[in-house]
Amino acid sequence: MRENAKSFYKILSKEAKMSCVKVFLTMCLFVAVALGQELTGDDIVKKVNDLINVETAYMKAKMTITTTSGAKRTFTYESWSKDRGAKTLMRYIAPPRVKGQAILMLNNANDIWMYFPRTGRVRKLATHAKKQKMMDSDFSYEDMGSGDTFIDDFTAKRLKDDKYEGEKCYKVELTKKPDSDISYSRLIMWVRKKDFVPVLIEYYDENNPEILIKRLYQKDIRIIDGIPTAFKIIMKSEIENSSTEIELIDVKYDIQISDDMFTERSLKK
């Protein structure tokens, strides 16, 4: 009996040792696989792009512009977008002096039309106008209607992970592609790990990648239709010391929007 017991414990000891070795090897394999699946800069930016560019969206928002002198101007507008932001229609509803004014952006803001209710005329802007300020804000037309720009116009490189306002973030550098006409030489983006919301984006000068020209902040993140949505978006100019804040009043995703809305005729409605 004693010999059998000793043999049993010896066998058990060997099996226990083997079990430990197997567990250790499994853990090593898991770590290796995890490292092999580490997200690249392109992976992160694709997730960001998929998050912010839904198929269709409606928004009502208030835009407050603070000029260099500290003066403030406020507009309220509605916007409709389709095809992942490639088509965007914006219509101002307040104050009275701009009520009815509308902006149509197609082909990722490469084609822009504006409607002025006082004259009843529709005017097509020159192609380079997409780089200009929209309604004298700190947002350009291409900022507001450029769809898949993070993927189409930039290459991505993952930098060292960082924190922003206590949140763990991926940090990614986006560098302008040689054939792109986007207004920025590069972007630095802080992306929350938990939901891939880009909470901070730095924009650098088109001709000098060392000159920071403005920063975008996304705050008050709420879940709407399963999508993390920033209800407060702030663009601050580092050159002019001005800022523009967009506060969402209402937002709806994946709604039915007719293609007829994105036509010159619809601007006058």
List PLM regions with ranges.
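A short, amphipathic edge element
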Residues: D42, A71-R73, G145-K157, L212-R215
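Bacterial N-terminal signal peptides that target proteins for export
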Residues: F8-L25
